[in-house]
């Protein structure tokens, strides 16, 4: 399987998000990389499904809550920027204050 660096990054994010979902299901709180991966994966998959940029910017801020993260993680993450592929091309999606 020949993957481009971008495709490898997408797979790594997807795997990290799967790990994060499993930890949430077990009642574990998320660390910084897990929180970022979960939000990023949500945006990438939403773009793949054809959702609008504005919709993903808003919905991305409701993927996880501060209670689902370790102490201090929500304060560390001000914005999450994701370069996602939409049906009409690649766009940058910025989720402001993603953990509330």
Swiss-Prot record:
EC primary class: hydrolase
UniProt cross-references to InterPro entries, sorted A to Z: Urease_gamma, Urease_gamma/gamma-beta_su, Urease_gamma_sf, Urease_subunit
Single Gene Ontology MF annotation: urease activity
Keyword DNA damage in record: no
CDD domains: Urease_gamma (cd00390)
GO biological process, one term: urea catabolic process
Subcellular location: Cytoplasm
Broad class of the protein's primary localization: cytoplasm
UniProt key word Hydrolase: yes
Key words, A-Z: Cytoplasm, Hydrolase
Catalysis performed (reactions): urea + 2 H2O + H(+) = hydrogencarbonate + 2 NH4(+)
Similarity field: Belongs to the urease gamma subunit family.
NCBIfam families hit by this protein: PRK13241.1 (NF009712), urease_gam (TIGR00193)
Protein name as catalogued: Urease subunit gamma
Organism this protein belongs to: Jannaschia sp. (strain CCS1)
